[in-house]
Swiss-Prot record:
Stated name of the protein: Putative uncharacterized protein YGR182C
Expression induction or repression: Repressed under low and increased under high copper conditions.
Further comment found in the protein's record: Partially overlaps TIM13.
Top-level taxon of origin: Eukaryota
Species whose genome carries this gene: Saccharomyces cerevisiae (strain ATCC 204508 / S288c)
Amino acid sequence: MSRQSAFKFQNGNRHERACLSDVHKILIIILYSTKGKRELGKRITHFMYIHIFCTYLYQASIVQYCSSTLLNVIAFSWYPLNLIYKYEYILRSKLILMVCLDFARSGGVLDSGDVSL
């Protein structure tokens, strides 16, 4: 392995750890800002849709995934639940569309990224 590729690999690992750390911070913020188990479950579900969507965009090389994208979820966690449902529906629709477009571009061959979703 060349020095340059080793450097890229190490940077990738650090980047993944940073993103995971952001995920944990946001989940803690959601936990502390939520009253009641039912509302908590809905907010965490909404957060996970956003996380999956952002992760898929990164894997598909459509946009560069960065921690600031996840930090935007904090704003969503303070919205009333009726607005959260609206955004969740939009995100799910976009995620399904992105998977379909990627599937069509790849000639209809599923890869491990599609299966993991």
